[in-house]
Amino acid sequence: MSLSKASSSEINLGEKLRQLAKRAQHLTEATLTHEFIQSLREFVLQATGYNPLSQLEERVLNGRSDARLGGLIYEIKTPKHPLDEAVTQCRSYLDGYRRQGIIARGVAYNGLELALISETGAEIWRGKAEDGASLLEAWLLLLASKVVDPQHLVLLLGFPSTLACNFIADLLHAFRKHEKLGFVEEAFKVWQAVYGTAANLTEEAVNALKQRAERFSPPIDVRNRNEALQFVFVLEVYLSVLLRLFVARLAVQQRLVEQSTLRDLLHPFGSRPTERLRQLATVIPLLSSVFEDDPFLWLCDVADADPTFADKFDSHLDDLACILDELDLVGVSYDFLRRFYQHFFDPPIRRALGEFYTDESIVNEVLEAAGFDGTIDGVLADITCGSGTFLVVVIRKLIEKERQRARPMPDATLLCSITGKVIGIDLHPFAIAMARVNYLLALGELLSHKTLQAIGRLHIPVYWADSLARLVVPKQRQLASLTEVVKIPALGEFTLPHHEEVDWEKLFSALKEALPQRGVADPKKVEEQLKKRLDEDIVSRFEVTLNRLAEQWAERHNRNRDSRWLPLIRNMLAVERLRGLCSLVVGNPPWVRIHNIEPSLRNRVYNDYAFCRTAGWQRGAELAGITTGFARQVDYAVAFIERGLELLKDGGILALVVTSKIQQALYASALREHFVTRCQILRLVDFSLYEQPLFFEATNYPLVFAVRKEKPDAKKKTTVTLVNRIGRHWTYKLPQNELPLLADDPQSPWLMAPTEAIAAFRKMQEGNPLLGDIEALRPRRGVLTDANRLFIVRRVEP
């Protein structure tokens, strides 16, 4: 949407159409379409101050419509065609839009006559075009600015939009000018520390970002990988601001605030939009958990320090609010936001930001493997939730199942049940921002004003936290002063009273209150104020720990590092409390080779997770003539498998989609041994021969598995499905102790074959040595390097 203002000269649409009718006989259809649509856009611009974007020749189920302005579809013919032709075609397009979930009205026009068609296809009015101008004007004012589909929203708020490009450019300039400002610098460091776990800034992605930046006006400089990283950061800042405003718009529509528009919500007397953006948790208390602090709100700190950027950001937020006020978020599904994100960026840029939307077909495959039927007794968690696809599908199934009951529970009870059972966790703050909005959209019909008022504050249990991080209890002599150590990427290490001894929520609230709003913090005064707000018993037992905590946060405050990171610490506790509690853990953990993740995170994974620490099939490495060091190049997903098992209660089920390489790779030896000897393997679906679209425009070769946390029962069999190269499924059952290649070695790769084939293979093994045991015949792996772009050739032809 172009935000250029209308001229002062009044536009008479009726007269415009009258003049156009005089020339219509001599115009081509393309010229007539252009002049007609331009006249309508000029009228809307004059009446509202905003110029609606037209979408020409938009593809629908029944062909291509000539044009669309918001919620109005146009079919335009020249005068030599009867109007009925345009009416018939327009009705066909409306039917196509309806089947896509888009409700619109139609306008049929042939240069002389006009017909207005309702959402159901009924003809509301027909006559001379100029005579229908008044009714057409009313429809234009009502529908021309409406946002009706994701592609339309991309045009308004994505790269085609001047508004988006200007906002993103100003964010980047503000960041580069103020990157040493306390919170700004730390926000980028925290984001950078977790960025590599969700995305990979390849050379292809850097080049795509450079090309995109060059198309800005004026062009933005992205000259190297570091500047490309900054560009990705501000893109996520822009999108996170949009997500906050989406939720605020939903709150307006559901009457959770007194204001009737988002623009009014951001413009109360005596306040500025940038300031209100930071206050949304307070302004909309019923949805406060959605507005948790994250690394993306640094633009508010820049606005406090720089009036020029404050004015620019206020203007951009105001323009965004005007557009979002035309969006019906009550009727919007999770799929709307997914498609908006997918169409916002080119594939290389989307991969640079991170692929967060798992394809729903594979999600359903995982849930089916777990036996999830829309009911759950206990907690269901996705510890790598990304944008929340698993959570959304689970919520949808829970609601559908409940609605089918003879006596379904009241909405308020169902809402509390879902938010108490369905939990998401992710390390990437942008993914979490998307997941919270998607969680809200999935609850959809349950979010009525009446229901929300009945439950009070709605808690969305989607946590920004490192699900692999464990709370560390140091060895101490005095049990009474038991403490825990929390490590946060890029922030450091914090020692806290044990969460079973002290309520962390109260501790963090007291700490925030003890710190001054402005100016320099005196550690002694902070310590004194903190102790005043806590019980005497706690102060006496944890005096040394509290003194150190007060000193740490006072020092952070004096370096402009404030207490906004406390949620990260609190969320770690939320994850830790899931240990041994979950009935079902599902998800799609990141597939990243361990050497590609941030070094400190890599070291922690090796130190903390046995599946990684003891990785490397020793016998296999010997047979292949390679070192176990190479065999220990684990996939990051292996650590999440181990963590998922920790969070399960006895009898709980872990169901994930992971790389199919864990069936054979040397690095997955400890994992395979644990599954075969200590779990009941329920289901294996092997796509290693058949590419599967895990993400939009991205294919992989995954394995879907489901295991129960219980001692294996030899009487039970594992259901295995192999998918061949043309997508055909072959399902069979076998005892899980028949999976290992070597019957006496549960660490060995799995034989993904039916029992008859395995029996034949075992017969071949009897009394016969392995080639790897015969030195002269041992297969060799060859030279292994990390120089994947270099090739050794014998001769290059001239």
Identify the role of each PLM range.
Residues S65-Y74:
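Active-site beta-strand-loop-beta-strand hairpin of nuclease catalytic cores
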Residues R59-N62, E113-G158, S361-I362, V392, ...:
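Signature of N6-adenine DNA methyltransferases within the class I
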